[in-house]
Amino acid sequence: RFAARHAVRRQVILLLERLDCRNRRIAIAAIDIGVVEAELFQLRLQILDRAAGCTFADLRVEHMKQIADLDLDGYAIGGLAVGEPTEVMYEMISQVEPHMPKDKIRYLMGVGTPGNIIEAVARGVDLFDCVMPSRNARHGHLNTWGGIINIKNAKYERDERPIDPACGCPVCRSYSRAYIRHLFKAEEILGMRLAVMHNLWFYNHLMERIRDELDAGTFTAFHDNYVKLLDTRI
């Protein structure tokens, strides 16, 4: 069964090889004949490609080596945020990353929790996208620097503190946990809006903090302090 799945994925990789080369030729030709302005292409239509291969490390590495020769604007690792175990995702990143161009964007698709992001950065990833901060917020799950809280829980009914005392977002500066919980319990749409605003602010601040820690050479300590804490439910 393993061999059969591997063989099928191998055929997918071969097909993607041909598509990668064709798409690159089409994009370059569009610039050459003036259909697309070169400056616009570079600024707004940057080409990224994705290293495929399911959970087969050898296929992912093989495909990454192939697309690395295409000199694209960035390279993505995808297909690891749709139910795969976290340990498998980290292993695939670790296997593929050494073969990704050092001077190009490294993009992990569809990831993830704050802990996932910190672990992926530790493995060389630059860029992420995910619905998690907004989707979780709409269900009352809010990120803080001490972990994740469920604002619907009864213990927040009379809690006058902000969602996160360490957060400087407009929501934390203006509203209490008790009020936001009330909005959720009353099914007021404002509750979800405030929750989404907070979580998006938190994620943006997390990325800023990661960049600062990398610049300061203190990212390893930051990783050790927060990689598990931020995903803990409190």
Residue ranges and their predicted role:
Residues R1-L48:
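Intrinsically disordered, low-complexity segments enriched in glycine and mixed charged residues
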Residues L19, F128, C167-P170:
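Secreted/extracellular small peptides and ectodomain modules produced from precursors
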Residues Q11-R18, S94, G146, N150, ...:
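Membrane-targeting and insertion segments and their boundary/processing signals
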Residues D164-I234:
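C-terminal extensions of enzymes
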